[in-house]
Amino acid sequence: FADPKNDIAFKKIFGDENHKEVLISFLNAVLDFQGEQTIVEVELTNPYQVPKIEALKETILDIKVTNQKQEHFIVEMQKKDLGDFAKRSLYYTSKAYVNQLDAGKNYHKLKKVYFIGLLNFTMFEGQSCISRHLILNQETNTQDLDDFEFCFIELQKFSKPLGQLSTLLDKWIYFIKNASSLEMVPKEFTGNSALEQAFDSAQMYNWNREEMDVYDYMHLKAWD
């Protein structure tokens, strides 16, 4: 299997217009959406396309999507700690919020923006691999300004073995962290169509030469 932490593999697995159920399942699991919050439909702002190698220096292979409520979601995989990811996540989230309206338009039309960052390095103190960040009232601890939400998953802090994966989110994190070291789909992942599709998309024998070239380029670039 391809390494989902590789930018092009991540975008192919989670940003494919033809397999939206993968991204929907992942988002619902990460954000713990249930009931009326559950995402049932998404529209990809920047669906998967194989980028040209010569353009990759200027290309950010994130995933941008809106749900049935027109809320915005940004998902980004970051392999290396460049020291600016926190600031960058704030910038992209703010930009997605501002870009919803032209100047002078009705601010009530602004929709919530979620940022999900998957990190192959340690960014925050603490033991948990998942941290959620909101704007809270310091005195009452209430979330009165609720149009921004950030979720960071630090893959290096996730250490559960296959036998201890108890939630769908556990399985998604395990898949992203460990898929490239597996030779077959574990039995713990069978029976879930989104997870099975994710493994199918990661099967490199299904990839064309152009995708393989970009994957290899991104793999080498990660070691620069």
Would you name each region that the model predicts?
Residues 1-151, 159-161:
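Accessory alpha/beta interaction modules
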Residues 7-8, 20-25, 87, 110-113, ...:
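Non-catalytic, well-ordered alpha-helical scaffold segments
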Residues 13, 17, 30, 156, ...:
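Generic structural signal for hydrophobic core residues of well-folded globular domains
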Residues 73-78, 170, 174-224:
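Short, charged alpha-helical interaction segments and adjacent helix-coil junctions
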Residues 130-136, 166-172, 218-220:
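Short intrinsically disordered coil segments
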Residues 145, 152-186:
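Compact structured core domains
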